[in-house]
Design a protein with these regions (language model features):
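Charged helix-capping and loop-helix junction motifs
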Residues: 92-95
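Helix-rich effector regions associated with P-loop NTPase G domains
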Residues: 29, 35-52, 58-77, 82-83, ...
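Canonical P-loop GTPase G-domain recognition
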Residues: 113-164
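Short aromatic-glycine-enriched beta-strand elements
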Residues: 12-16
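A conserved segment at the C-terminal end of the G1
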Residues: 166-182
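Structural detector for short beta-strands of small beta-barrel domains
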Residues: 1-10
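Catalytic P-loop NTPase motifs of RecA-like helicase/translocase cores
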Residues: 87, 117-118, 142, 216-219
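A short macromolecule-binding patch
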Residues: 22-29
């Protein structure tokens, strides 16, 4: 039996890197009977059948699980946003960051295309937030050294809306990837996703990146009762203030004596971040247990 990590799952096959080789594996039927599937990022026990093939026999305990995109054991979610066309909506960033926080992941926001827009509204917002933010350019290489340092020694999942240059950034980090790069439509102001499946790549030194299909894949199960119950905790800027609110159970939406609202008014919490919180709160407030899939 060998131990390895799943780097790719495609058409019923799991590609497991054991350190010595990559095995093309099938999963035992017991996984299907137990209602679970091995995921990219999983550490697994595999039986080597020879000829580069094997069977996944067991999945080791996971530190976290994302069902969409299907990946496990993510240390850090790297959100790629665009400082130029197509400019990323702050709500999309905040929504994904909230899900990552719920899953126990670190979050890193990277604003690509900084060579095209130096007066960046997104940077103004997030440089005053609790989310770490980098300005980078896949075109010029600006900020990529800082990005490499920020992802070192971690399993990082990269995501971003179409057209932000995710594949271009990954190609700069690991040139041998040769990931396809799409173009941004001038008419629509958005790109077309070129990533079709989740795949893990090793950058060396214990650093790994997972390329995911993008923001749209993060919807559904993650937006559930658990996020509803812990929503304020997923906005780290709120942490210094939530225990100072006048009322226990304050929702930080409209209550008198809410210290979070006062911090927003005072400029200590970015108003844009709080607007995203309110939008998420409105989406989740009426969700009931029987509605959870």
């Amino acid at each position: 039996m060998s131990r390895g990590r799943i780097e790719k799952a495609l058409s019923g096959f799991y590609y497991v890197n054991t350190g010595a080789e990559t095995l093309q594996c099938r999963a035992r039927g017991k996984f299907r009977r137990e209602g679970m599937s091995p995921l990219v990022g999983d550490w697994v026990q595999v039986r080597d059948l020879g000829g580069g093939e094997g069977f996944v026999e067991a999945v080791e305990p996971r530190r976290n699980v994302f069902s969409r995109p299907a990946a496990a054991n993510i240390d850090q979610l790297v959100i790629l946003a665009s400082a130029a066309i197509p400019v990323t909506e702050p709500y999309l960033i905040d929504r994904i960051a909230a899900i990552a926080a719920l899953k126990g992941c670190q979050v890193l926001l990277c604003l690509n295309k900084c060579d095209l827009n130096t007066a960046d509204e997104l940077y103004d917002i997030y440089s005053h937030s609790a989310l770490p933010v980098l300005r980078i350019s896949a075109e010029t290489g600006e900020g990529l050294a800082a990005l490499r340092a920020a992802i070192a020694g971690k399993l990082n999942a990269f995501t971003g809306n179409s057209g932000v240059g995710k594949s271009s950034v990954l190609n700069r980090l690991l040139p041998e990837l040769h990931l396809p790069v799409g173009e941004v439509s001038k008419a629509l102001g958005r790109g077309r996703h070129t990533t079709r499946h989740v795949e893990l790549f090793a950058l060396g030194g214990g650093t790994y990146v997972i390329d995911t299909p993008g923001f749209s894949s993060f919807y559904t199960e993650e937006m559930d009762l658990e996020l509803k119950a812990h929503l304020p905790e997923t906005f780290p800027e709120f942490a210094p203030y939530v225990d100072q609110c006048r009322f226990t159970g304050c929702t930080h939406t409209k209550e008198k004596g809410c210290r979070v609202l006062q911090a927003v008014k005072d400029g200590d919490i970015p108003a844009s971040r709080h607007r995203s919180y309110l939008r998420l709160y409105d989406e989740l407030k009426d969700l009931r247990a029987w509605q959870k899939k």
